C-alpha cells in the first residue's frame, strides 16, 4: 500500500509535492482566495501556478505539509492523474462577455458536478465556449461545446497534446438540456466501449464519428 499523501503529486525532485484544489470552471470566491493565501503563507509554498485547465497548482511542499494543508483549505481535490474527468474549462459566456451567445459557465458547472468522481477509461477534459470564438478551446478537448445563436454545437475527440487533433462535430443546434443529455449518452458509450487508458481522441478515431452518431443519436 502506498504511503504517498492523498491528493498530492510527487515532483521531479522526488522530495516535494504539488496539490491541485478543485475550482470548477476556474471560478473562485474571496473566501477561497483568502484560504489559499493563508495556507500558502503558513506552509511557505514556493510556487502558486494557474494551470491551463483553469485550476490552481500549489507546488513545492514537503510530504508532512500536504495533509494539514488540505484540512485547512477545506477544498475538494482537483484530480490530475487519475482516470476520470480532470476538469471543465469554460469562458465567461453570457454571464459577462459581450460576445457570449450561450451560458458557458452555467452548463460548465453543471457538467462538472455531474461527472466529478466518476471513473472513465482515461482522463477526460471538457472545453466550453459561449461563442464561436472558442475561448474554451472546445475543439481541442475530449468533449467540447460551442455556443451559437441557434444553440450548442457538441464536439468530441479533440486533443491538444503531443499528437493534436481537432474534434469532430457530433451534433448542432442543441438546447442546453439536449446538450447535457447527448453528452451523457456519449460518455456512457465511451465508458462502455473504450479500452483502458484509450483517450477520447483515439477512441473517436478508432470507432469513427459516423458509428458514434448512430450509437448515440439513434
From Swiss-Prot:
The keyword Amino-acid biosynthesis applies. PROSITE patterns: NIR_SIR. [4Fe-4S] cluster binds at residues 91, 97, 131, 135. SUPFAM superfamilies: Nitrite and sulphite reductase 4Fe-4S domain-like, Nitrite/Sulfite reductase N-terminal domain-like. One of its GO terms (molecular function) is metal ion binding. This enzyme catalyzes the 6-electron reduction of sulfite to sulfide. This is one of several activities required for the biosynthesis of L-cysteine from sulfate. This is Sulfite reductase, assimilatory-type. It comes from Nitratidesulfovibrio vulgaris (strain ATCC 29579 / DSM 644 / CCUG 34227 / NCIMB 8303 / VKM B-1760 / Hildenborough) (Desulfovibrio vulgaris). The lineage of its organism: Bacteria, Pseudomonadati, Thermodesulfobacteriota, Desulfovibrionia, Desulfovibrionales.
